[in-house]
């Protein structure tokens, strides 16, 4: 029990990094001496279990988180401030995932890998026309879409349901209001239960990552390291550009000094980088907003909302990683599929929980939306490579998520005359 307690209390990030390094070493050694088949038979199943656990969580988290996220936008508070911040969050997320796609095309990660698990190459399905993709967003059977893992229809229904619940909770009819509150409480309970399961699954992550990376290294050799380095570089260069080209430019346009802003924001940014949790960083983020001279009436609404629905860093990561996986499979993503990535990543950001590891679960959802299901062994193998470095990518993307929340809050406060002069503006 003492050893188990020590394992649980040891930081997850460090455990995953240890699993990654040991898996790479073991895989390279065993692969070099011709034991790749043994790794596939005896080690890989532990990694497959990790992937299955993540797949198990995808649709329940998508549905519950999106309903709760959409319902958190109260019509009473939406008003002018709410509309401004929601539009800001959606537009910056769209720019982030587009920037991720651009970075992926520049760095071209995964092109040096040619996956063929069991000698079978990935066989892409013919992409449907864009009009059909858009029409299929509206489900004919929402519960069937949820059960069958159809991502975009589930997102659409969850958002519509969340908005409907919000309006019912503001009904003058007490019975209707209580029914809506009960329904939301139940769905919120489901979401919280899913987050708890995520935390449990992340305790198994070091073992899963060890097994997956050992298998990939035994099969593919050292060339995988270079391709994963490209993914890491593409994500971090993209995240840096998101701060410089989006946040700094917007701050400058609205008369806020970017340097003063960053000096004030650094505590929240560093906390987000270390904890990998937007929600966990929220108390620090709110303190930083107060120190910036932002009115409590603004930041007390925009920052909790941002921790729920604004995930610019995660959206960018999904753009890069989807391209990496497609490249590793030798699959070309059409313009329609790239637009689907943008649409799905932006909508998914509304339901991406602000907890460590949630971004990897949402990536599985984005992959499904462009015809790269984890049920395919080649897709699962490429996804496994991303899981190996996900903790490293998670630190940077969470920092950008929080920086984006603060940027939007400062801009809205400035436009509303709720930003103290002489602090950052």
Curated annotation (Swiss-Prot):
Changing residue 395 to R: Increased rate of aspartate transport. GO terms for cellular component: plasma membrane. InterPro entries: Na-dicarboxylate_symporter, Na-dicarboxylate_symporter_CS, Na:dicarbo_symporter_sf. It is a multi-pass membrane protein. It comes from the Archaea. PANTHER family: PROTON/GLUTAMATE-ASPARTATE SYMPORTER (PTHR42865), PROTON_GLUTAMATE-ASPARTATE SYMPORTER (PTHR42865:SF7). This is Glutamate transporter homolog.
């Amino acid at each position: 029990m003492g050893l188990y307690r020590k394992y649980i209390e040891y930081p997850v990030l460090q455990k995953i990094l240890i699993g990654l390094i040991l898996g790479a070493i073991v895989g390279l050694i065993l692969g070099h001496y011709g034991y790749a088949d043994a790794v596939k038979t005896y080690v890989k199943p532990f990694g497959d279990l990790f992937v299955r656990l993540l797949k198990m969580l995808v649709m329940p988290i998508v549905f519950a988180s999106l309903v709760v996220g959409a319902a958190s936008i109260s019509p009473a508070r939406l008003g002018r401030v709410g509309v401004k911040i929601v539009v800001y969050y959606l537009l910056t997320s769209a720019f982030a995932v587009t920037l991720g796609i651009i970075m992926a095309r520049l760095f071209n990660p995964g092109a040096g890998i040619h996956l063929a698990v069991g000698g079978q190459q990935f066989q892409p399905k013919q992409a449907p026309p864009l009009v059909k993709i858009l029409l299929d967003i509206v489900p004919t059977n929402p519960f069937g879409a949820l059960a069958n893992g159809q991502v975009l229809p589930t997102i659409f229904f969850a958002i519509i349901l969340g908005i409907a619940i919000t309006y019912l909770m503001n009904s003058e009819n007490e019975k209707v209001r209580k029914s809506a509150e009960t329904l939301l409480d139940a769905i919120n309970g489901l979401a919280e239960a899913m987050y708890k399961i995520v935390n449990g699954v992340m305790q198994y992550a070091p073992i899963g990552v060890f097994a997956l990376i050992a298998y990939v290294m035994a099969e593919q050799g050292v060339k995988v390291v270079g391709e994963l380095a490209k993914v890491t570089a593409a994500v971090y260069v993209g995240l840096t550009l998101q701060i410089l080209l989006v946040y700094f430019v917007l701050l400058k346009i609205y008369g806020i000094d970017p340097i003063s802003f960053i000096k004030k924001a650094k505590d929240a940014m560093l906390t987000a980088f270390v904890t990998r949790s937007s929600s966990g960083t929220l108390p620090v983020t709110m303190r930083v907003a107060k120190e910036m001279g932002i009115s409590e009436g603004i930041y007390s609404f925009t920052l909790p909302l941002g921790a729920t629905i604004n995930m610019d860093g995660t959206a960018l990561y999904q753009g890069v990683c989807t391209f990496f996986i497609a490249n590793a499979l030798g699959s070309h993503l059409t313009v329609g599929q790239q637009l689907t990535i943008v649409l799905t990543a932006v909508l998914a950001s509304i339901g991406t929980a602000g907890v460590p590891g949630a971004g990897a679960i949402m990536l599985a959802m984005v992959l499904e939306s462009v015809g790269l299901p984890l049920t395919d062994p080649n897709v699962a193998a490429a996804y496994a490579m991303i899981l190996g470095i996900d903790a490293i990518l998670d630190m940077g993307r969470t920092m950008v998520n929080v920086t984006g929340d603060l940027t939007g809050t400062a801009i809205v406060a400035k436009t509303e005359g709720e930003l103290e002069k002489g602090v950052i503006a």
